[in-house]
Amino acid sequence: MKKKAIVIGSGAGGAMAAHMLASKFDVTVLEAGQAFKPFSLPLEQLAKVRKTGLYFDERMIQMLLPSMRIDKQREMIMVYGRGVGGTTTLATGNAVRADEGLKKIGINLDEEFNELFQELPITTDHQRYWSPTTKKTFEVMQQMGFDPQPMPKLLRPNKCRMCGHCSMGCPTRAKWDTRELLDGINVMTGCKVTRIDIGDGKAKRVHIEQKSSLLSLHTTHLELEADIIIVAAGGYGTPDILRASGIDCEPHLFVDPVLCVAAPMANARQQRQLLMPFVSMRDKYIISPYMDWLSFFFNHQWYKPIDGMVSLMIKLADVEQGDVHRNHMTKQLTPLDHQRLQQGVKDCREILMGMGVKEQDIFLGTLNAGHPGGMLPLSEAEAETLHSPLLPDNLYVCDASLLPQSLGLPPILTIMALAKRIARIISE
């Protein structure tokens, strides 16, 4: 009889760990959200309703897309996924190796990254689909010395219809996400894990509050036992589960803040483009074309025609300082973060003006973030085991909580590489 494994979370870390363990363990995945459904309404139709004032708070997006969760803070908005596939269903499908911080503490994931590049549909063969505006942006950035490079994508380009829905769920499944790793695995949805019982140096029992549907008022309490328990509820969910189970976490939160810089541009049609088609690597931030739907619908400065604006994203590697408690973020950018962000804004202004935009027409988006992590960071002492001494022997963490420093880069591939290694350690 196979041993039992419980995996809490179905995002990049949880789904990959479950997939890797399924041959040797009887795996059950517990997902707090429900089955993912992509946003299906035409964005052009929703755009016509903006001036009515109906869209007055970013949290309203949860009504249209239940898998997208919003934590609104004074300085920024936290966006994360809750549903089968985790945040991978809402990410733009970027496949970037971002393990510099792990290398510094002696963790080499070359083997795992090589496997991922062989196993997954990772490609840069999407340039032929770029719009004239995307091509122009790329050329201007090349001429200005920003060294833009096509973004590796988890993508099947021949299935992509350039609908611009990448961050709201791909309607054609052209974009790969971790739901594809879960075929044949028992996934229990609507299962919010409240705590894990720990005794005699072992994780013994998982306590769950299960809802049959998103709108259900009835909750069932469940208790499950397993030989191995993996917490992969994301950098936002994992700290709460660990603390409720008596395991402390560090106030070491990073979130990779995002700020978009935009301007009017006739017939730009950026809403019908692949999001983040290429990237410029800067010092502690990146720049990439990105239609910021959160700002478009809820930031009044963005009340421009949907096909008549161009937007550049700054994604920042922020200082690891902050906390999450009961699904609520405490996070402020430091003076150094603001300094780097302002340099990014300056770069974007120069690029847009290089494309013919007038400086006075440039406006900023809403500061938001979607890559929380770092609250149970690995150190050199755990380079071989990838297992914190704060955890019982049979309890592992397998998400961005383990990352020792902010990335300022898309984290999905790196989290999956970590998950592969952790699953191997468990199996051996």
Give the positions of each predicted feature:
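A glycine-rich dinucleotide-binding beta-alpha-beta segment and adjacent secondary-structure elements
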Residues: N158-G169, T189, T194-R195, G344-S406, ...
